Amino acid sequence: MTTTRNNSPTDGLEEPVGEDQEPAAPVTTGRGPLGLLDRHPYLVVAVVAAMVGTAHAVWIWTHRHLGAFDPDEAGYIANALRFQRSIDLGNPMAFVRTVGGTGTGPVVPFLSLPFLLLGPRDPRMAMMVQPVLLVVSALAVAGIARRLAGPRTAVAAGLVWATLPTVALATQSYWLGLGAATFAALAVWALLESDRLTNRWTYAYGACIALMAMSRTMAVAFAPALGLAGVVVAGRDKKAWWGLVKAGLVAVAMAGPWWLVNWDSLTEYLFSYGYGKRAALFGQGTVVDRIWFRLTRIGESTNLSTASDWSNPVQAVVAVTVASSAWSVGRDYRKDRTLPAGLRGGLAVGAAVVAGIAALASTTNNGVWFELPVVVLLVPLTLAAASRGWWGLRVVLGAAFLAFGVWTLGRSLWLIGPGTSQPPRSAHYEDGFAQYDTRFSSDRRDQLAAATADWRATNRRVFRTLAELVPTGDPVPATVSGNMVLLNANSLALQAELDVVDFRPEIPDTVRSTRERAKFLAPTTTDSGGTEIERLLVLELHDKILFTPDEKVRDFARQARAAGWKVVGTVPLPTGGVVEILRHRDNL
């Protein structure tokens, strides 16, 4: 026995499916503007999200200055530039080795390549992938919501996601959270389109899990959550379970090689900063404290709360709307014993959200944008849950999210001044950078260009002083200690890529014993081919906040001088302090 249903992400296409398979949410077609939403929900989301993304792209080009990249951004952008530099049609394996040997998620830097190949070799060109990810993720959110509750909810969910504060700031930054969230959403969308893991979307589901796991190293923690969603969709269907196995094999085949090649460095980093002693440096508390912290972060990212205030009235509207929707579903069930078409899919997405929050709560490391892969699923789930609520409540909720979205865009595009009430209160880097140079403060934006110019010049001068000590064309090996946000091994690596020079930095853990630090003070090191070359030493001496491995930089500096290292160059820092460049006396 077969039945027919609408299986397409657009309307009007039907195909036979087994009676045990879940139908898509019913399609309703209205007239006028509502008819457009019903017939072409993805087109509406794509057009509006593209407009939002274009606005962010313009902001990136006009406001992201080279001296205003945080260390993670600088490192990721340097990776993208290095990927581009390694492209050689005569030696394609050089590109494979460069990408495959990258110790941080390579997917987003890889996706930046078309922009770097078509445009100038500028960090801002690499960042242009972020607005594209915004559009793709908005479509994926709409796709999930379409499967759960129909086209109108799809439009609402896609546009709410595209205008959230956390998404706006992630789009304007070159962090990897947006990439991880995009592929998490694409994976779930593919899962819901897979006819319970029986068609070709099954392979897309597995592929997107792999891409998520290679987008950001910590995102591998969300792979079990997406796998759990697959288990819920499969249910007791043996054919669906075979599809789940195939999706898993695709995921392992795609992500496995990169994880195996970099296994030691990836696991050492993840366990050290996720569950080791260093995790406590970025957050503490019991499991309950961590769950509350994550829920607060999610509230901030969705305009529903601030860190200390959960009294936002929209929370009540959301809760009452969802409750009225549940009442409506219960009423219909009592009447004719039917449940919503997207119920199994909704349970799958809900399971992924709960498992994702559990993964977040398993570590004390607060992280930045760790919650995005959860939020990207929570948005369509919440709006789908509210989609059958009372009409008046849905209108109020829609108006609230529209107002929040306009406000968010105004704030994030700097059309509205910074503030302390409704997020986003500042660009993601402003408050952090202001701890090192007050000119980066959100209330001193007129000084941003001058501040970034000073720090760009400082990074350039430090790296070029190093490069002058090395024969032209040779890699520049340096041990760098005293790292801080505005000048560090990653910012120097970015400058090296802009100068098209191979930079090989090492960062000693100065907190360790004198004996363990001594290996970073040997006069020589080796290049990638094992050849012995001179080691250079960079010491940043200042009174600013240091990175965790650099806390004992002054002890390390004294040890270096005692071991025969001599200062051969100095560069003053814009806010006080100095960068010393040293060579060992055996190499002078």
Ranges and model annotations:
Residues 193, 221-252, 328-337, 380, ...:
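Perimembrane helix-loop-helix junctions
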Residues 52-53, 157-163, 189, 209-213:
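Short helix- or helix-capping micro-motifs
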Residues 243-289, 293, 357, 362, ...:
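Membrane-lumen/periplasm interface segments of specific transmembrane helices
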Residues 62-74, 87-109, 124, 485:
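Membrane-proximal lumenal/periplasmic loop motifs of glycosylation machinery
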Residues 207, 248-252, 386-430:
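Signature aromatic-anchored transmembrane alpha helix within multi-pass, membrane-resident enzymes
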Residues 127-130, 166-180, 367-368:
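Short acidic/glycine- and proline-prone juxtamembrane loop motifs at membrane-interface regions
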Residues 231, 307-343, 354-355, 394-398, ...:
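Hydrophobic, aromatic-rich transmembrane alpha-helices
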Residues 7, 147-152, 184-204, 212, ...:
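Membrane-interface transmembrane helices that cradle and orient dolichyl/undecaprenyl
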